[in-house]
Amino acid sequence: MVTIRADEISNIIRERIEQYNREVTIVNTGTVLQVGDGIARIYGLDEVMAGELVEFEEGTIGIALNLESNNVGVVLMGDGLMIQEGSSVKATGKIAQIPVSEAYLGRVINALANPIDGRGKISASESRLIESPAPGIISRRSVYEPLQTGLIAIDSMIPIGRGQRELIIGDRQTGKTAVATDTILNQQGQNVICVYVAIGQKASSVAQVVTSLQERGAMEYTIVVAETADSPATLQYLAPYTGAALAEYFMYREQHTLIIYDDLSKQAQAYRQMSLLLRRPPGREAYPGDVFYLHSRLLERAAKLSSQLGEGSMTALPIVETQSGDVSAYIPTNVISITDGQIFLSADLFNAGIRPAINVGISVSRVGSAAQIKAMKQVAGKLKLELAQFAELEAFSQFSSDLDKATQNQLARGQRLRELLKQSQSAPLTVEEQIMTIYTGTNGYLDGLEIGQVRKFLVQLRTYLKTNKPQFQEIISSTKTLTAEAESFLKEGIQEQLERFLLLEKL
């Protein structure tokens, strides 16, 4: 018979008592009542926060958006096909955040900051909340540095400053994305980090943009955040905030950033879909009541920081698509009222071969003129005035056949000025090139040329001045002013090239 030793038993019991740990972990859990259409209704989750991430039993993550008296409405960040009624859900205690680092440059990622370009994981030691508060009034300073787009029409008449929000608005297929990508290409060597956010676009369109940026070496300073048309509405809604969080990371590190949202109409549609499925009451055009706040809290994050915070900046170029030129629809009017100006692209101008198809008459920049360099101000004022007068005269001249000589001259000048604003895609011009181009047009040097010869002459003139009158560009880049000396170099160059050009054309 086995002898039972009481001292051994008491030792074991004592050890067990000493090892006993009374730590209690409280997990906030709930049960799935209903799931479908990217929405789940959860019973329980009593302590959940608005916007908190929740995790389903099979691994899908969701965001708690509707906190109701008897259930919680959760939007899913995935298809959620494996979620079953009655399965458990636990709150994570975290608000949506993404990892951020310099390693994201040159990469294509999704709204959760996971790479989708097949080039491996991205290392990051820091993280930022996707929805962080915008800088306050004291944290900002007024816009004073220019952000050059490389497009004459914009940089001369609708200038953009670093820290500004400028809307690009127009119908489909009017070149909105082209204006945005040209602006990214023009930031080469300007020490500006670019973030391009594609929301609900065709995957082929996004691939095209990425390829054109790679070919021209622009991906080195660019991050692409893409949620294509087949992505869940939740991720399309989150993508712009992810892009803003990445741009903010660089802005607070005393760098300049440019962010493009292409386009916010699709984000609003994704948000409308989520809201209607969550049974939130619909308003105008069936959008929920807080669709203005959706865009205002995003665009207010663009800022020019004060000198105490390092003078970093975040310039936002949101894109909005209109239906047959209707700028008075709900989303366009909302975004126009939030931004500091808009660039209006017209389908009629586009079809008439005027590209970029910018309607200068109704495009405006509310703060950018403070950021223009002096040399550009000197030449752009005259250009604006002459184009405005030309537009007015052109409308009148359609009704009248016998025009006096002065009117005919003014119309001829206007047609040539319109011609000099035309630019090929992916061919941005430097400020110096823009100044020489505008000066040539406004001072009548193009009046003797046929309209068809204008662009050919300007291309040759820019090359000629670059090689034979480099002093002009040096003076402009160092003084930022069109000095008398610079003007004399420019006049000489134009006269010489004009004589050469006319001689060669006659042969």
From Swiss-Prot:
Pfam families: ATP-synt_ab, ATP-synt_ab_C, ATP-synt_ab_N. It is a peripheral membrane protein. Its EC number is 7.1.2.2. The keyword Endoplasmic reticulum does not apply. InterPro entries: ATP_synth_asu-like_sf, ATP_synth_asu_C, ATP_synth_asu_C_sf, ATP_synth_F1_a_nt-bd_dom, ATP_synth_F1_asu, ATPase_a/bsu_AS, ATPase_F1/V1/A1_a/bsu_N, ATPase_F1/V1/A1_a/bsu_N_sf. It is found in: Plastid, Chloroplast thylakoid membrane. Keywords: ATP synthesis, ATP-binding, CF(1), Chloroplast, Hydrogen ion transport, Ion transport, Membrane, Nucleotide-binding, Phosphoprotein, Plastid, Thylakoid, Translocase, Transport. The keyword Thylakoid applies. It catalyses: ATP + H2O + 4 H(+)(in) = ADP + phosphate + 5 H(+)(out). F-type ATPases have 2 components, CF(1) - the catalytic core - and CF(0) - the membrane proton channel. CF(1) has five subunits: alpha(3), beta(3), gamma(1), delta(1), epsilon(1). CF(0) has four main subunits: a, b, b' and c. This is ATP synthase subunit alpha, chloroplastic.
